[in-house]
Amino acid sequence: MLRLMRQKKLSIQRRTKTTVSSTTTGGKSKEVQVEVRKKRTVKTDIAQQEEAKLKAQQEAEAKKIAEQKAIEEKARLEAEKVAAKKEADEKVKAETAKPVKSAVDSKVKSVDPEKEKRKAEEAELRRKAEELARQKAEEQARRAAEEAKRYAEADDSDNESSSEDYSDYNLSSRYALEAEDEEDRRNENRGRGKNKVAKAKKGGRDDENSKNSKNERESNRKNQKDAKFGKGKNGKKGAALQQAFTKPAQVVKSDVVIGETITVAELANKMAVKATEIIKMMMKMGEMVTINQVIDQETAQLVAEELGHKVILRNENELEEAVLGDRDVNAEKVTRAPVVTIMGHVDHGKTSLLDYIRKAKVAAGEAGGITQHIGAYHVEMDDGKMITFLDTPGHAAFTSMRARGAKATDIVVLVVAADDGVMPQTIEAIQHAKAAGAPLVVAVNKIDKPEANLDRVEQELLQHDVISEKFGGDVQFVPVSAKKGTGVDDLLDAILLQSEVLELTAVKDGMASGVVIESYLDKGRGPVATILVQSGTLRKGDIVLCGFEYGRVRAMRDENGKEVDEAGPSIPVELLGLSGVPAAGDEATVVRDEKKAREVALYRQGKFREVKLARQQKAKLENMFSNMSEGDVAELNVIVKADVQGSVEAIVQALNELSTNEVKVKVVGSGVGGITETDATLATASNAIIVGFNVRADATARRVIEAENIDLRYYSIIYELLNEIKAAMSGMLEPEFKQEIIGLAEVRDVFRHPKFGAIAGCMVTEGVVKRNNPIRVLRDNVVIFEGELESLRRFKDDVSEVRNGMECGIGVKNYNDVKVGDQIEVFEVVEVKRSI
């Protein structure tokens, strides 16, 4: 019971002692000690009990509702499950009874198939409906459970808020009690105010002294603490806390790791110097750089060593070397077929000769007699020997393509027309062959023509160090006629003889490697690359790393478009399955791991971007001062799209060579494949013309081109393209002005006029003198004044022009020193059209 009382009540007891002054009967003052006792009992637990009771009641109600709902839902689900089971049992019974019934019915009558089908459909529909109903019931049950849960949570939150209210009430009541106590205390002390003041006065000095001594103690303690930690006026820092950094007298030398490329800022960081120091150093070395400029390894090494650091060169392409090193190429070498490149001047009969050899009419399809793409074909001889031919274009613009063809080749067949002799591209072909170190075989074509002169060809080639066997050299000269087929067999024999001398061998078994002859983007097949296999055997399914691209070989086709599963050395094939269009001339290598091949390709792309950026920045810095001094140069923006990579390169190179000091051709975009909407949008943004070489614009691109009035031009022959671009550039040239003399008048007499000053009486000796044209005054055929006419009169009339043989009066504006015998020359400024 006592515990219960303690829980319900809280008793507060307080004793207060005070002194009361009173006067006795004798008149004397007497102080009496009085003790006041107070007791207060506070009920504390009633509100908490009520709160707990209410909370328990609400929780019980919420729990009861949730349980009731769950029981109802469970009962309903059980009922549905029983019904579904019953229906399934009935269905099974019906299905088991069906064969018996059908057997009985078959004796009486034949089964109606339509009826059976309908019944099956009805059963299927019924099953679906039951499934749907079951899903719906489950969904409703889930929702009901969530709703009950939500109600329960809401009740809990309400209970919490009510309990907070109660706690606030208790807190506030406690504060009220404390306030009451404070008030009582003040009332009790009010009667002692006088004595208290007296005591304060009496002990005021002592209190003040104690306060001062306390302040002194605190300040002393603080000073001691400050002195300990090195603070305050007289504080000296401890040895452990003193900063002992002194600037080093010389730069700290360290090892600097430099990759293949590095920015100036990164190099400065690695050497722990300011970037300005490096920029100054490079300016002394004659190089202008910015803080973010990429510099190559050699330059960075030179700068670091100049500043006294030790350089460690890092090889960044370790992964590439590891991937390319992990290849099975140790097989035995066997004799391979020679790769022959046919070179020569335009229309000297290269493609016709190759066509005769292949016995297939491909030359007729070449536009304007120029081979547009590198064609790669292999032919088999009667004795089983094989020769692979590369046909390179002859036009000067395709120099890069021809150089690429020479890199992949073993023997160069130089075709020279017997009636035409050595031409510019013939000389270029000789230079390419020499640069590639490939031996020459000269095919003197068109010997069936009456004006053919074999000796003349030999003499002209002699001037370019191509010495025939007749003159004691080692170059075979074979006279042929591509039209009639004369001497073609002799040419093939000469090629095979030359290949035997070279002793050409390659690994046949093992992982393949080769070179990209041509590449383009096919709309249906994706990136297509023509690859000449140089060693190993390329098989379907191999993983190929090719320049910046990689991929698995999905399909291979030979030059006739026939599917092949493998290709050995010296065999050209079209390959599908690369991630993008590789650049012509890229090396194609078969590797083991596709993931590593992808990493190498991405690394190469990043490296190429860095090098390109470095080149651009260098060009910008080099051209900075020249651009500042020059005026604005007219720019002709061009977007080039072609069917193959080789053509794109050749056209871009030719267009860049057309640029002059006044008009610059800027290729803002180029690529392989048809003209797309992106190209049209770029042309709009950069105010460019679009050039399509053997490609066309798609429907969306045409709509943009028509809407924006973009200049779109299609070509199939490179001569026409270059001529039209020249014409467009000519239109952008600053016009040239020329002065043309239209009349000459001789001064016969001079009159004075009060208004016009000196008036020259003249005879027109040549042409026409016009009133509004500029004039020159000549004395002894020397120009002494240039200006304009103020008046032109014939007798008393003002006229606009005076013709040859007539007299007139001429007043020259702002010039009065006209004398007899002077000549007045009238001219006009004519604009002359310029061309490149």
Swiss-Prot record:
InterPro entries: EF-G-like_DII, EFTu-like_2, IF2_assoc_dom_bac, IF2_II, IF2_N, P-loop_NTPase, Small_GTP-bd, T_Tr_GTP-bd_dom. GO terms for cellular component: cytosol. It comes from Haemophilus influenzae (strain PittEE). Residues 1-43, 83-240 are annotated as: Disordered. Transmembrane segments: none annotated. Residues 83-153, 203-229 have a biased composition (Basic and acidic residues). Residues 481-483 are annotated as: G5. GTP binds at residues 344-351, 391-395, 445-448. Residues 154-167 have a biased composition (Acidic residues). Residues 369-373 are annotated as: G2. Residues 18-27 have a biased composition (Low complexity). It comes from the Bacteria. It is found in: Cytoplasm. GO terms for molecular function: GTP binding; GTPase activity; guanosine tetraphosphate binding; translation initiation factor activity. Belongs to the TRAFAC class translation factor GTPase superfamily. Classic translation factor GTPase family. IF-2 subfamily. Pfam families: EF-G_D2, GTP_EFTU, GTP_EFTU_D2, IF-2, IF2_assoc, IF2_N. This is Translation initiation factor IF-2. The lineage of its organism: Bacteria, Pseudomonadati, Pseudomonadota, Gammaproteobacteria, Pasteurellales.
